[in-house]
């Protein structure tokens, strides 16, 4: 019987805001008792997680005094040590406080933009104190409901200026952060800048330090836009910009549901795990997901265990797919190579172009049947556990 227990090598992490979510939503209040960061660390230690991530105010309330901050940090460090947890990633809450109701780095108000930088610098210090090496930027309020309210070109310029500033700040302070940008098409704003992961992949080369910057794609956010998440992650991998990843699940075209990983679209989750494992992704596998609102405290533990267990099961099934003789024979069959033609098309040269123009390629003969139904059915049988 395979072992599906959490493997430390997988670097499974959860945010303080995930398992600590008391179940409130826009239509109803809290349904579970709020638990402290120390209690969350104890919970994650119990279920076998590798680490925990946080926004600055998940750990330290925005109005905490310096002595209160120091005590919170001290207590949390002890809880991390007691539970053998690490903090791989930190981020800033630039969306909850009323000051950010119309944006943070992209706000029309220079004082708000300055406060956003100040708050982020302090949050970066907090993350560095816990050893975080990835710093995520999710622009929760960076957007509009009406384009009459802000010039989108200026908004992008403002965002670039802020990131350039913070890159230099990280270098100056010796934090050695890698920045990871997280896209989302809407919610809480009606329309959000950098709506999908590809938006950030296009934006990063324009920065002063593109080598420091990558992406943190999230399953739910790309599904909200109706996109194939595996393809978004593949683009990030190919660009060498997959610095972090948020795993959860989501029905297409809905509000941000943040379901338990693999609970809504199992086939998509399978191909995601296969992609990450096939390409040797070595970063954190962060479950930015939430237990059902109906769950009690014990069921929240089941939720956390379920996220990790599903990943481990799909990892095993991906390995089985890769070694299934019938599947691999089909893969070989559908990938038709011609060494001479491949050599000609790999890099342009005038001579190569002439040879390709003169090549006797029969378009009618190229219309061949492909066994894709069979391949997909075999894939489904692997996922369903009958192969």
Question: Model-flagged regions — what are they?
Answer:
Residues 52-53, 88, 135, 179, ...:
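Hydrophobic residues within beta-strands of alpha/beta enzymes
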Residues 1-129, 133-134, 164, 209-216, ...:
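N-terminal pre-domain/capping segments
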């Amino acid at each position: 019987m395979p072992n599906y227990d959490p493997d430390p090598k997988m670097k499974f992490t959860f945010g303080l805001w995930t398992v600590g979510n008391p179940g409130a939503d826009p239509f109803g209040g809290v349904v579970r008792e709020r638990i402290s960061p120390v209690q969350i660390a104890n919970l994650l230690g119990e279920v076998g997680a590798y680490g925990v991530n946080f926004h600055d105010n998940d750990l330290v309330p925005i109005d905490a005094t310096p002595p209160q901050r120091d005590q919170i940090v001290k207590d949390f460090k002890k809880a991390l040590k007691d539970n053998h947890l690490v903090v791989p990633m930190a981020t800033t809450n630039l969306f909850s406080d009323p000051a950010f109701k119309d944006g943070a780095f992209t706000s029309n108000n220079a004082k708000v933009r300055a406060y956003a930088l100040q708050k982020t610098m302090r949050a970066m210090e907090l993350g560095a104190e816990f050893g975080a090496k990835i710093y995520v930027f999710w622009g929760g309020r960076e957007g509009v409901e009406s384009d009459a309210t802000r010039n989108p070109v200026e908004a992008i310029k403002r965002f670039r200026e802020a990131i350039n500033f913070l890159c230099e700040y990280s270098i100056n302070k010796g934090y050695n952060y890698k920045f990871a940008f997280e896209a989302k098409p809407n919610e809480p704003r009606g329309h959000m800048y950098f709506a999908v992961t590809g938006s950030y992949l296009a934006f990063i080369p324009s920065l002063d330090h593109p080598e420091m910057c990558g992406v943190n794609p999230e399953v739910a956010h790309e599904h909200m836009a109706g996109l194939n998440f595996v393809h978004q992650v593949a683009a990030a991998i190919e660009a060498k910009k997959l610095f972090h990843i948020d795993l959860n699940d989501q029905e297409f075209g809905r509000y941000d549901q943040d379901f338990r990983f693999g609970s809504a679209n199992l086939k998509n989750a399978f191909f995601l795990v296969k992609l990450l494992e096939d390409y040797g992704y070595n970063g954190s596998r962060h479950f930015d997901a939430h237990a059902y609102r109906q769950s009690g405290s014990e069921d929240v533990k089941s939720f956390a265990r379920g996220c990790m267990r599903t990943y481990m099961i799909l990892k095993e099934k991906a390995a089985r797919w890769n070694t299934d003789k019938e599947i691999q024979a089909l893969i070989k069959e559908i990938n038709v190579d011609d060494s001479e033609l491949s050599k000609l098309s790999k890099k342009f040269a005038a001579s190569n172009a002439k040879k390709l123009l003169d090549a006797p390629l029969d378009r009618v003969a190229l219309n061949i049947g492909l066994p894709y139904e069979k391949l997909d059915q075999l894939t489904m049988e692997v996922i369903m556990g009958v192969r």
